[in-house]
């Protein structure tokens, strides 16, 4: 397959960074965006992992102008993007009685509305090209209730719904869309969660990690490269019928 132009949001760490690496290895030209991507230190670190040719630019998916401007700059620099991976995401932990409206809004704006803004920004070019692939990083939390994560669960449930609508509407134009719903993944976000769990329950980080590892049948934590491998397959010519799906990478856990 001829290399295509890909955008990966949240592409400086975790699942986004691993996905960018997989797409580059497949021959695609990749632009990664994140809120902290404008600093020279972040650009240098990302290029150490992905190579000097990758485009690294600031992107705030909570801001429509930032999304539109990012896509315009990528188009001018690399060409028309026909692959979009919405990996930008945050979480805020609080039980309903203590969940602030600000934290709720932040999660919806970044995890759900951010994916909508980026999809809307690239969609016309994908329609014109007659080909497009959009992968949205959701979560098993989008289909299961996780106590203390109301905003996160709601945003990921919405993202699964957005993915299905995008798949149905885009099918006539050669555009496929899936949601990918991992369980716990070895990322900086997960590390932060371990610290919060350990502090709340007054246990060590090692104990917090062990509890999560043993909460699924495989007894381990999913690696970001596993998610990236699925996205790589989805974006290939080997999977034309792979769309309108919520694919769980859950290490066997039914939650």
Predicted regions and their residues:
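Active-site helix of classical SDR
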Residues: 119, 155, 163
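C-terminal substrate-recognition "lid" of short-chain dehydrogenase/reductases
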Residues: 116-117, 131, 218-249
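Residue(s) in the substrate-gating loop at a strand-loop-helix junction
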Residues: 139
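Alpha-helical segment proximal to the catalytic Tyr-Lys
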Residues: 124, 168-169, 240
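Short, small/polar-rich loop/turn modules that mediate ligand/substrate recognition or access, typified
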Residues: 171, 176, 242-244
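Conserved glycine-rich cofactor-binding loop
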Residues: 5, 12-13
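Substrate-binding pocket helix/loop in short-chain dehydrogenase/reductase
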Residues: 95-96, 100-108, 134, 212
């Amino acid at each position: 397959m001829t290399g295509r132009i890909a955008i990966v949001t949240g592409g400086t760490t975790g699942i986004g960074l691993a996905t960018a690496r997989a797409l580059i290895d497949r021959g695609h030209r990749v632009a990664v965006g994140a809120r902290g991507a404008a600093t020279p230190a972040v650009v240098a670190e990302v290029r150490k992992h992905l190579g000097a040719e990758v485009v690294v630019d600031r992107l705030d998916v909570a801001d429509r102008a930032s999304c539109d401007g990012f896509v315009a700059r990528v188009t001018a620099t690399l060409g028309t993007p026909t692959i979009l991976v919405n990996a930008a995401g945050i979480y805020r932990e609080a039980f309903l009685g203590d969940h602030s409206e600000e934290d709720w809004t932040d999660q919806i704006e970044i995890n759900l509305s951010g994916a909508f803004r980026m999809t809307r920004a690239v969609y016309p070019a994908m329609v014109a090209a007659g080909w497009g692939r959009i992968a949205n990083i959701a979560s098993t939390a989008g289909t299961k209730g996780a106590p203390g994560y109301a905003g996160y669960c709601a945003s990921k449930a919405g993202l699964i719904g957005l993915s299905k609508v995008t798949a149905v509407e885009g099918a006539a134009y050669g555009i496929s869309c899936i949601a990918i719903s991992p369980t716990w993944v070895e990322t900086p976000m997960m590390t932060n969660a371990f610290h919060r769990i350990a502090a709340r329950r007054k246990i060590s980080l090692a104990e917090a990690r062990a509890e999560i590892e043993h909460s699924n049948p495989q007894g381990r934590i999913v690696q970001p490269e596993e998610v990236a491998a699925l996205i790589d397959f989805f974006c290939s010519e080997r999977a034309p019928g792979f769309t309108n799906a919520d694919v769980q990478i859950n290490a066997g856990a039914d939650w």
